[in-house]
Amino acid sequence: MGVPAFFRWLTKKYPATVVNANEDRQRGVDGRRVPVDCTQPNPNFQEFDNLYLDMNGIIHPCTHPEDRPAPKNEDEMFALIFEYIDRIFSIVRPRRLLYMAIDGVAPRAKMNQQRSRRFRASKEMAEKAASIEEQRRRLIAEGIAVPQKKKDEEEAHFDSNCITPGTPFMARLADALRYYIHDRVTNDPAWANIEIILSDANVPGEGEHKIMDYIRKQRGNPAHDPNTVHCLCGADADLIMLGIATHEANFNIIREEFVPNQPRACELCGQYGHELKECRGAENDTDLGDEYCKPEQREKNFIFLRIPVLREYLEKEMAMPNLPFQFNLERALDDWVFLCFFVGNDFLPHLPSLEIREGAIDRLIKLYKEMVYEMKGYLTKDGIPELDRVEMIMRGLGKVEDEIFKRRQQDEERFKENQKNKKARMQQYGRGRGGRGRGRGQPAYVPSHGILAPMSAPMHHSGESTRQMASDARQAAMQFNATNDANAQAAANLKALLNVKGEQSPAEVAAQESRKRKAEQPIIITDEDEEPKDDIRLYESGWKERYYRAKFDVGSDDVDFRHRVAWAYVEGLCWVLRYYYQGCSSWDWYFPYHYAPFASDFETVGEFKPDFTRPTKPFNPLEQLMSVFPAASKQHLPVEWQKLMTEDESPIIDLYPADFRIDLNGKKYAWQGVALLPFVDEQRLLETLKSVYPTLTDEEKYRNTRGPNRIFIGRNHKSFAFFQQVAESKSNDLVDLDPSLLNGVSGKISYDSTATAPGLPFPSPVSHEECQDLPTNCGICVLYEDPEYPANYVFPAVRLDGAKEAEKTLRPEDWNERRDGRFNPTIGFNRNAPRGGLDLSGQRHINHHVRGAMYDRQGGNDNYRGGYRGGYQGGYDDRRGGRGGGGYRGGYNDSRPDFGRNYAGREGGGPQHYHEHQPGGGHGRPHDQQPYQDNRRGGGYHRGGRGNGPTGYQRPPYRGGRGRGGGGYQGNSSWR
């Protein structure tokens, strides 16, 4: 979804929504991998009924990974996809249904974004290749050896644009997935009693929306279990909105944990530690090896995002006192989803005044809560917005647009000044007090070679957070590399240290080094990241005139045009909301502009009446390829169709520009800009394609058809006999399913002429050691259709009768410990899940090592963070003069109630005892671990005496307060 930073913003504001996924790892026995037994209870102490896979989020990282070497061939890609699905399956362990959805042909509104992405990717690839070749020629001209081009790698280059419906790759992937399902149904007991639905690329619709359509249509059937536990796998931000829009009682999202700032290898030499423009061209050093600077490859972890917990947060956030109408949480949540669309989505550009990094969603929610008394009702109902109320919200936002733009400019100027100052500090810091090649802070009298060459020193911590220190270190390293060739020098230093007993002496090394060394460069603050020229200047008067003149080539005094743009935008909002709540209302609608209007232009949208009653249908797969592909990806199309992209005589050659302009639109990087591509003229395209349709082969015709969903079960499933009867009938007539035999699944099935019958061998289409032929197929496959509803049916956006609310995670605002007892927060999915803990000896061990190291790094009494011996030690040793922080683990205090998380279950376990002493006193009393309390100044889990010790345990994104210790309830902690 087009909301950059949305997931980061949401999880930072609502931290308890995220739970780390526990998983059982595969074991190796005698060199063979032993698969995880997924019939065992779920390691996350939560049993899931249905698992949905948004397959494109799996296909892309498996076919062209960014954190490991690329697969050698297509078969290896398929094997990696199977392995990825196995891993997700072993974490979630669905007990009823597995639904695999691959992106099919998308609506026109989405196709415009797909077109922009693919053309932009093609342009960036060409520019990168040109940059690599230019750097190669420059290094060769300087007499520097460069790695030779590897012909086999060039020929095997994988074009990720082939992950689009209608390509041969997607057809082969569908065949491979059918084999994979039959293999697992035959050999894995955990698959024996579940249903598997495969919606491949020939089924129209985006993967996540095919999943939502399935859930909506199952909810409308009386046989649906309202307490079904859902889990959807995918990384798109819009999955969060879709999860809320289902109104299901227990909906969860599983995704890879995002690790920012991952190192990438140089495109020319393949080594780490520098960028292309800093490459010196040499092959991997034969002595040190690439492993010297290559980062450790770690398997990515998975996290769950719990929609029920997000609902708890939003219930508190959307609470409004003294409403003139009855509060309805489900309607309020739908309004929250709708307001998020203004910040960005895949179908509309975001409003110029709304940037998520500037708190746009918070601003909209605040405005909504202020104006709801004037609106006297909600913004939406069942996915249909009330446009007169939308106009009121936009009118309120339009009044503060001037202020937003001016504040944005002030913030940007302040940020640029801070970055400039930081760069100056980093340059000075990178040089240290010595000369070229010395480590940070290395004394000038220490030689940078030979046996006295220093190894890396321990990191010196300041009072800044770990994240800030990491950022500083990265920038220091980058600047040091750019000015002093730090990586090459560090390698030379290490080789000098290792070669002391070798052929060269330290003196010889020093002599060689002096001959190689270039003139030392002065510290220069360059504006290498110079900001693009801003001709709009939204922060100055006349901004609207300049904006419309530059972006639309009209004057702002053309009120009718501004209203047309605003009406088209509102029509898009109506389309998007229906898409999320009712399904695709029009396959051919799209927003016909590259830029959004201003909020102050929504003056008359209350009068607008959108109409989506005209029947439409999706493109065929090959027609979509012609709509979204650049000419550089033409190899995935039939030969005669390719010519329409490249030949000058083609009637549609203008749709495939070799180059195009990217408007940065106030941004810094090209990927953030707007690709100014011509919109596809649907009628002209389809009319032109009629001339090449007769040239299609049978295989190409099959790839160009709209296909059905397929449902699979195993021989041990209780519906196997019924499915076999349908398959043996070889009839195309649809037969109703019995939900009681399929875990509540409703719909219709019919014979699949392409399926392999049970009992027959199933040859593997994948040439890989992990993908062997099946001697006897034990699965059965038939075609599947969702339940049907009338054309004008409206799916109600409500909580179903009989749905049980998930167990609360956040502490109620009216909780009183004296009255209600100690609050036991939910850690993970289950409040009663076993928790790890430490005995007293373990606590002492941690205190001794961690606190001791903290004291050493922070400088003891002189550091602003703490007293002589803070925390646990300071608690019982106050007589020695230090005013220690209270408990072993300090906590945090959220100034906004109920946004806190209790991490006691992960590290601390049950009640922990220690001795609390008053300053100067020699006596003490045992004190139990106390829960987090938001109504006290200190956020500590443990109550202790007053003190100035370290704030205790810190967990991002929270930082203990500076100054007095956060361990005790009288210490100060802060939300960061």
Curated annotation (Swiss-Prot):
Chain intervals annotated as zinc finger (CCHC-type): 264-281
Gene Ontology biological process: miRNA catabolic process; mRNA processing; nuclear-transcribed mRNA catabolic process; regulation of development, heterochronic; regulation of vulval development; termination of RNA polymerase II transcription
Alphabetized, the UniProt keywords read: Exonuclease, Hydrolase, Metal-binding, mRNA processing, Nuclease, Nucleus, Transcription, Transcription regulation, Transcription termination, Zinc, Zinc-finger
Identify the EC number(s): 3.1.13.-
Molecular function terms in GO for this entry?
5'-3' exonuclease activity; 5'-3' RNA exonuclease activity; RNA binding; zinc ion binding
Q: Which InterPro entries match?
A: 5_3_exoribonuclease, Xrn1_helical, Xrn1_N, Xrn2/3/4
Q: Which family does it belong to?
A: Belongs to the 5'-3' exonuclease family. XRN2/RAT1 subfamily.
What's the name of the protein? 5'-3' exoribonuclease 2 homolog
